[in-house]
Amino acid sequence: MLKKTIRDVDIAGKRVFVRVDFNVPFNERGEVADDTRIRAVLPTIEYLLTGGAAVILASHLGRPKGKRDDRFSLRPVADRLSALTARQVRFAAEAVGPETEAASRELAPGDILLLENIRFYPEEEQNDPEFASRLAALADLYVNDAFGTAHRAHASTAGIAAHLPAVAGLLLERELDILGRLLSVPERPFVALIGGAKISDKIGVLERLIEKADYLLVGGGMANTFLAAQGHNLQASLVEADRLETARYLLAKAGPGERITLPIDLVVAPDREQPEKRATVAVESIPAGWAAFDLGSGTVRLYANRLRPARTIFWNGPVGLFEVPGFDRGTLDLARVIAAAEATTVVGGGDTVAAVKQAGVLDQVTHVSTGGGASLKLLEGRELPGVAVLQNR
């Protein structure tokens, strides 16, 4: 780890501004429905509190578009965090302003203050220097523990570091270490499973994985585009017609052999609303007007045989329309294969994590990345703005 972390600085008696990712779902009663992201940052919070710091937490929630919207208030998160930490968590109804500044000055070691949704302010996503300065005025030290937003140059992820000493939290440190090792010194065989709808979303990471992985297994809608680039008729399946040349370029870059491994059969149906009519067919035998919605059983076996001997596995993106019963088998079966592998297993992306949970194997993977877009940018070799601004060791 080339960046300083909270272990490298004096925290006793300090007010510490921690950027976290509490972008969590609520249930119909307005309570936190899934506290995974809150639990992920607890080690950082506990380390700071035990070390004699007062903690000021800032996060976004949803997309309020730069204005107050009570549907996206973080107040319910304060209640959940209080339960998880067994401490009173104070809540500031404004992220900045005289009342919040007064509340921050009154904090004693061991106190926690959660600010209201940072994206209620348009200046946040604009990385406004004045807004960043007002956030910095609340604290003595800045900590980024929000890997999921580290690829964004916002006031609370980048701009604030111009005004305070800036270091990484324990969650961010773990993400950078694990994902960094994934590409620098992976134990081999290294197998990557990449799904999702579009090649265009993942061109950079596909290029990098072709160079680094022993096998790159492709699923989801993007597999259709690769198959179409090889000349297969995918009928009504999702295909990015404007990315066929990109797919051919990636296949050529991989060279002969099966470094890029594509489906040999697919689960097809007349449309997504009729899974009961599904059939498994070879990729060259899709009925006219039908579309692919999942990997076929032969492909699942092929991919499982690539994954089982692996010593390092990275998975991003479901391989089918797993949220629809009948089109979920490929994703869930491969989730269980990955979880059972004697390998370092890293999964990332919101849909992928949801699939692993649905398969009941979340606790069996080595690392669940808290950042979808951020993990892909890092694996591409791109510098993350929220990491670049942190102090070097």
Curated annotation (Swiss-Prot):
Substrate binds at D21, F22, N23, R37, H60, L61, G62, R63, R119, R152. CDD domains: Phosphoglycerate_kinase. GO terms for biological process: gluconeogenesis; glycolytic process. Signal peptide: none annotated. Pathway: Carbohydrate degradation; glycolysis; pyruvate from D-glyceraldehyde 3-phosphate: step 2/5. It is found in: Cytoplasm. It catalyses: (2R)-3-phosphoglycerate + ATP = (2R)-3-phospho-glyceroyl phosphate + ADP. It comes from the Bacteria. Pfam families: PGK. InterPro entries: Phosphoglycerate_kinase, Phosphoglycerate_kinase_CS, Phosphoglycerate_kinase_N, Phosphoglycerate_kinase_sf. ATP binds at K202, E323, G349, G350, D351, T352. Its EC number is 2.7.2.3. This is Phosphoglycerate kinase. It comes from Desulforudis audaxviator (strain MP104C). The lineage of its organism: Bacteria, Bacillati, Bacillota, Clostridia, Thermoanaerobacterales. The gene is pgk.
